[in-house]
Amino acid sequence: GTVTDIQIKTGNIPAQASSSLTFTANFDASDAAIDRTTVPFDATNSSSYTDSYTTTVYDSLGNEHSVCQYFTKTSDNTWEVQYTFDGQQQTGVPATTLTFDPNTGKLTSPTTPQTIEFQTDAAAPIDLTVDYSTCTQYGSEFSVTTNAADGYASATQNGVQVDDDGKVYATYSNGERMLQGQVVLATFPNENGLEAVSGTAWVQ
């Protein structure tokens, strides 16, 4: 491609609503099942679910929210997922059922990401697509290895970062960084033979 000057964008970046969550966890196969006919789900009752985990998400205005997933083993190799949004149970959001292969411990259902809608007070609803495809069920304690939601609040630029491969990023106050370009790098067989000609320019 054409080599040209790198232009670093300045100013703010707008908020981006969360739309996807990649979630990877192991569920303990030895956990006792909870009978939903006698113990209905209640987020305030820890005996009504097996495990829980919270994710931070953002709405279209950049407001921060919390989505908590409550996992309940309901029978052998079957788990139910209920959700709260900012601490409130979501009566209009159906539970997700996770089913695992009894021989391999790998997820067999659902085979595609699940989209869950959460209503906000002032911003557009958050349609969050949750991918459980890499979850497992083995005889070891509940553990989460990936809890990655996209989205972020609006932010101001606060710096520039250059990676080892020459990629140049603008960095922002919300922790995001955006690629601006890449510095052309070259390797010289005799670095000691380089001669400085001006500033950061060298000749061999």
How would you describe each model-predicted region?
Residues 1-204:
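Small/polar low-complexity and glycine-rich loop motifs
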